[in-house]
Amino acid sequence: MAEMKSGDIRAMSEDQMDDAILNLKKERFNLRFQRATGQLEDTSRLREARRDIARIKTIAAQKRAGKTK
């Protein structure tokens, strides 16, 4: 999965964001195992997945804060 753009994330619904976070967490779990066993070739993907999760969580929090104002 390529790096997610913030514009794409903002277009998602809350359910889609939750699904994306779940998928990224699963991917991160698998990548960590690959790294531990020496099978991981693209080590930068770990960083991208971690930052994608943070990006989605940040935008979700901004959306929630915008609704309450």
From Swiss-Prot:
It comes from Rhodopseudomonas palustris (strain HaA2). Belongs to the universal ribosomal protein uL29 family. GO terms for cellular component: cytosolic large ribosomal subunit. The gene is rpmC. The keyword Metal-binding does not apply. CDD domains: Ribosomal_L29_HIP. Gene3D superfamilies: 1.10.287.310. SUPFAM superfamilies: Ribosomal protein L29 (L29p). It comes from the Bacteria. This is Large ribosomal subunit protein uL29. The keyword Flavoprotein does not apply. Keywords: Ribonucleoprotein, Ribosomal protein. One of its GO terms (biological process) is translation. One of its GO terms (molecular function) is structural constituent of ribosome.
